[in-house]
Regions:
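C-terminal motif of bacterial Sec signal peptides marking the signal peptidase cleavage site
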Residues: 21-25
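Extracytoplasmic/secreted proteins, especially bacterial periplasmic and envelope-associated proteins
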Residues: 72-79, 105, 113, 117, ...
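Short beta-alpha junctions and helix-cap segments that line functional grooves
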Residues: 144-148
């Protein structure tokens, strides 16, 4: 009679170990090349959505009950416009958001005003308005969920979302 296990088990185990070691030996060698225009040390290829989000910035924030762009927001949007003018293959969606206070209808309208303020600024900086669509989520998609001013501040925002690269037809 043959015993089950024994040598067969050892051979299977050795085979699995050999495969794992071979896969580890095939891993990346050397340091990855850093790309990007910021000083964050992030790894992002030029013209990639990662570069846009990390090095350029995809969020601007607003004061309570306001769709007026602050100086900081204008600075971030200026960088966005430069990047979008350089990489014209992207279309964008500007998502307008609000904090949890107020009615759903009020916050949807406020989110729409915030998204339009961003679109208008980007267009004034040379980004073709046909590449920019807007949507308001009002208070429906918060970043931070709590009943405190620190959360409300984070949720009063507009986010620029890159869509798949488009064929220039605008």
């Amino acid at each position: 009679m043959r015993s089950s296990g024994g040598i067969g088990y050892v051979c299977k185990f050795a085979g699995v170990v050999a495969i794992v070691l071979l896969m580890a030996a095939c891993g990346r060698h050397g340091e990855p090349k850093e790309y990007g225009i910021g000083t964050t040390g992030s790894i992002a290829a030029p013209g990639s959505p990662q570069e846009f989000a990390v090095n350029v910035g995809d969020l601007v924030h607003f004061e309570e009950d306001s769709s007026t762009l602050s100086g900081e927001a204008r600075s971030i949007l200026g960088h966005q416009a430069s990047w979008l003018n350089q990489y014209a293959q992207y279309r964008v969606t500007i998502e307008g958001h609000a904090d949890e206070r107020g009615t759903r209808e009020y916050n949807l309208a406020l989110g729409a005003k915030r998204a339009m303020a961003v679109k208008s600024f980007l267009a004034s900086q040379g980004v073709n308005a046909a590449r920019i669509k807007t949507i308001s989520y009002g208070k429906e998609r918060p970043i931070a969920v709590c009943d405190e001013p620190s959360c409300w501040t984070q949720n009063r925002r507009a986010q620029t979302v890159l869509n798949n690269p488009a064929v220039a037809r605008y």
